[in-house]
Amino acid sequence: MPHRKKKPFIEKKKAVSFHLVHRSQRDPLAADETAPQRVLLPTQKIKDEERRAEQRKYGVFFDDDYDYLQHLKEPSGPSELIPTSPFGAPYRGDGREEPLATSTSGIKLPSSVFASEFEEDVGLLNKAAPVSGPRLDFDPDIVAALDDDFDFDNPDNLLEDDFILQANKPTEEEEGMEIQKSEAEDDSEWEDVDDEKEGGSDDDRYDRAGSSDEDMSAPGKPLGAIENHFFWEEETKSRFTEYSLTSSVMRRNEQLTLHDERFEKFYEQYDDDEIGALDNAELEGSIQVDSNRLEEVLNDYYKEKAENCVKLNTLEPFEDQDLPVNELDGSEEEETVTVVLEEAKEKWDCESICSTYSNVYNHPQLIKYQPKPKQIRLSSKTGIPLNVLPKKGLTAKQVERMQMINNSDLPKTSTQPRLKRESKEDKRARKRAIKEERKERRVEKKANKLAFKLEKRRQEKELLNLKKNVEGLKL
C-alpha cells in the first residue's frame, strides 16, 4: 500500500489561540452569577523577533513578551475607523479581502465564553468607590483649611497674643450692670433696716424705693426694666436641654436652628397644662438591703402604722351595758386549762453562699474513687492463677546445699591464676580442666533447674488442693 500522509488533529495554520482572562469590570455580565467570570481573548500572532527589533529602535531593550510599543504611540495622530468583524479578514485598499492564516470558519463556541459586545462607562468597582469631589455638607472653613485656601493674612482670622485676657476681661456694660446691682442691694438692705425701726407704711417704702431707683436708672429706660430684668435673668433655656442655645460651642447655622425649633415645638406639647394622661411607668431594678433609702421607707411605714393603731391602756366595761347573771355566777368558778407551749423554732435571718449549696436534708460529700479489681491471670502451663498463691522461700535442705557450694574450699580451675612462664603441656591441661569443669557445671545447673521446676509445680498443686479442701490421692 502506498504511504498516505496522516491528517493532523490540529492544523497550526488554521488554528486560533486564545488567552483565558478575567471578565472586564465594565462588562454587564460581571455581576451575573450564572455567567462565567473568565472569557476567551484571541491572541495576536506577531512574531516576537520583529516586535523586539521594533522596540530596540525606540530604546526598549526588555527581553519579555510584553508589548511596550502600545505606550509609545502618538496620542494625537491621525486615525481612521474601518468596520470589520472580530475574526474577519483585514480590509485592503483595492477592495479585496486578504484571508488570514487563522480562519475561524470551523469554530463554533457559545457567546458566553467571550466578552460582551457592549460595555458600561463606569466599572463595577468604581461604582462602590467613596464619594470624591467637593462636599457641600462640610463647614466652609474646614474645607478651606483642608484645601490650603485659608487666608492667614486676614487680620480677622488672626488671634492676639493676649486673647485669653481679652476674653476674660469684662466689658463696660457688664461693669455698669454689676455696679448698679451692688448699689441696689445695699439700698435695699438699708431700706429694710429703716422699715423695721420706723414701721412706716407701704406707701412710704414705695416712695423711697422709687426715689432710689430713679437715681441709678439709665436715661431713657423705665425703673422696673433695670431692677427686675437683668441680662443674666433672661429666659434663654430651651424645653429639652435646660441650657442656653447660645452657649453651645457649635455655631448655630440655619439647619441647626431649624432643628432646635422643631425640638422646641415638639416639647411644647408636653407642657404641664397640656400634658394629659400618661401611662403608668414600669420601674425595674434592684436595691441594696442596707441602703439608706430603704431604711427611710421602712421607718415612714412603721410611723404611719403606729399612728393609725389604737391602743387601750385600761379595760373597762361600758356604763350602759349590764352583764348577764350567768356570766357573773360563772366568774366565781375557776377552770383549769392546760396550755402546751411550744418552743419557737429558730428562724434564719440571713443566708450565706454555703447555705445555697445544701440544706438540712442534703449533705453532699465527695465520691470516693474505687479502683477496678485486677483481672485474674492464669498460667498457660499449669492453669493455676498467677500472683494469687503465697510464695515460699527455699527449704532448709536447699539452703544448706547452697551454703555448702558457696563455702566450698576446693579451688576451681577457672579461679586459679595463670603462671607467666607456663609451658604448652600445662596450658593444654589447664584448658582441658576448665572445659570439664564447665561441662559439669552445665549438667549441675540443668539438674538444679529441673528439680526446682518440679518442686515448684508440686507445691503449687498442694496449695491449690488445700484451698479447695481436696485431698491429694496417689495411685
Swiss-Prot record:
Keywords, alphabetical: Coiled coil, Phosphoprotein, Ribosome biogenesis
Record flagged with keyword Transferase: no
GO biological process: ribosomal small subunit biogenesis; ribosomal small subunit export from nucleus; ribosome biogenesis
Composition bias, Polar residues: 406-417
Biased composition (Acidic residues): 184-197
Compositionally biased residues, Basic and acidic residues: 198-211, 419-447
Residue(s) carrying Phosphoserine: 17, 24, 248, 331, 408
Annotated disulfide bonds: none
Listed GO CC annotations: cytosol; nucleus; preribosome, small subunit precursor
Region (Disordered) residue spans: 23-53, 73-104, 161-223, 406-447
Its job: Essential for ribosome biogenesis.
Membership in a protein family: Belongs to the LTV1 family.
Name of the protein described by the UniProt record: Protein LTV1 homolog
Source species of the chain: Bos taurus
